[in-house]
Curated annotation (Swiss-Prot):
<dbReference type="Pfam" id="PF02289">
    <property type="entry name" value="MCH"/>
</dbReference>
<comment type="pathway">
    <text>One-carbon metabolism; methanogenesis from CO(2); 5,10-methenyl-5,6,7,8-tetrahydromethanopterin from CO(2): step 3/3.</text>
</comment>
<keyword id="KW-0963">Cytoplasm</keyword>
<dbReference type="InterPro" id="IPR003209">
    <property type="entry name" value="METHMP_CycHdrlase"/>
</dbReference>
<comment type="function">
    <text>Catalyzes the reversible interconversion of 5-formyl-H(4)MPT to methenyl-H(4)MPT(+).</text>
</comment>
<protein>
    <recommendedName>
        <fullName>Methenyltetrahydromethanopterin cyclohydrolase</fullName>
        <ecNumber>3.5.4.27</ecNumber>
    </recommendedName>
</protein>
<dbReference type="GO" id="GO:0005737">
    <property type="term" value="C:cytoplasm"/>
</dbReference>
<comment type="similarity">
    <text>Belongs to the MCH family.</text>
</comment>
<dbReference type="GO" id="GO:0018759">
    <property type="term" value="F:methenyltetrahydromethanopterin cyclohydrolase activity"/>
</dbReference>
<dbReference type="GO" id="GO:0019386">
    <property type="term" value="P:methanogenesis, from carbon dioxide"/>
</dbReference>
<dbReference type="GO" id="GO:0006730">
    <property type="term" value="P:one-carbon metabolic process"/>
</dbReference>
<keyword id="KW-0378">Hydrolase</keyword>
<keyword id="KW-0554">One-carbon metabolism</keyword>
<keyword id="KW-0484">Methanogenesis</keyword>
């Protein structure tokens, strides 16, 4: 079985070799852990963001930069293709580990989750568990982790602190924007799972999403980065569905972000109206705007949802001069 942490370790080695070109900074903590700053104090950029996305996906996807037509604007976007969608997206990429140690907080994603089984129910559902001597984690945070944070991660992953490797970028950074847009395929799979679909029948995934500019601090950027997927993210999935075609059609109808009661305005506005309480925001919003599913059993193809570039332009706050 594929070891997502072994795959991630190889990407980390590349990042260490190319840190100057990536405009990242490498820190060695007192307990031997490795921290790669991709945008907290370091400048980072598109290439650092690409490496972050590769790390999140355990290098189990083909990633490329492309352009997206945003009502006539040629906008930077990222394209994701994977033939290991469940392991790449759910066993690794999904941001399923909220890490809070003292005054430090970050959202953890990437391979290390498969060692700590974060969350355990998901790994039981997909039948995956990793076993590797090193833990590779991507942290979305505006602070760099210290030794206490590393010790917390090491304990949960059953590895030595010196074998913990963390790449960090805040939401309000180009690298952070890139790795969030690269979640376009994952958000669709997660939404499928949340509506009761057997995600293990998903055999491949493809998606494209625009990359948000830095529009403010982390909380504002959390809005614009999510909007890239919610309003202009487009995905394609290949599945082997054992049920009736009508049943598959019902599942596909439920997945796009358009089904959410909060759909229709920039996410930051929705979040602000909810007093910045995630639990008051409809979780169904976190999904691609449009998806297409090709079922290999019925050889039928189904599509649902639509793209809404005008809302994304509003979210970005672009001014023509």
């Amino acid at each position: 079985m594929i070891s997502v942490n072994e795959m991630g370790s190889n990407v980390i080695e590349e990042m260490l070799d190319w840190s100057e070109d990536l405009k990242t900074e490498v820190l060695k903590l007192n307990n031997g852990a490795t921290v790669i700053d991709c945008g907290v104090k370091a400048e980072g950029g598109y290439e650092a963001g690409m490496y972050l996305a590769r790390l999140c996906l355990a290098d189990l996807a083909d990633l490329k930069y492309t352009t997206f037509d945003l009502n006539g604007l040629k906008w930077p976007a990222i394209q994701v293709a994977t033939d290991n969608p469940v392991i790449a997206c759910m066993a690794s990429q999904y941001a399923g580990w909220r890490i809070s140690v003292g005054n430090y907080f970050g959202m953890g994603s990437g391979p290390a989750r498969a060692l700590g089984l974060k969350p355990k129910e998901l790994y039981e559902e997909i039948g995956y568990e990793d076993d590797f001597e090193a833990a590779v984690l991507v942290m979305e945070s505006d602070k760099l982790p210290d030794e206490k944070v590393v010790e917390f991660i090491a304990k949960h992953c059953s590895v030595d602190p010196e074998n913990v490797m963390i790449a960090v970028a805040p939401t309000a950074s180009i690298a952070g924007s890139v790795q969030i847009s690269a979640r376009v395929v994952e958000t669709g799979i997660h939404k499928f799972e949340s509506v009761g679909f057997d995600i293990n029948c998903i055999k491949s995934g493809y998606g494209v999403a625009p990359i948000a500019p830095v529009v403010g601090k982390d909380v504002q950027c959390m809005g614009s980065t999510n909007d890239c997927v919610i309003y202009c993210g487009e995905t394609n999935y290949t599945v082997r569905f054992d049920g009736e075609l009508a049943e598959l059609e019902e599942f596909v109808k439920k997945v796009p972000s358009t089904t959410s009661q909060d759909f229709g305005k920039p996410f930051y506005q929705t979040f602000k109206e909810a007093n910045f309480d995630f639990f008051k925001v409809d979780a169904g919003m976190f999904a691609p705007a449009r998806l297409t599913v090709n079922d290999l059993n019925s050889t039928k193809t189904i599509s649902s949802g639509g793209l809404y570039p005008e809302i994304l332009l509003q979210s970005f706050g672009i001014r023509n001069v």
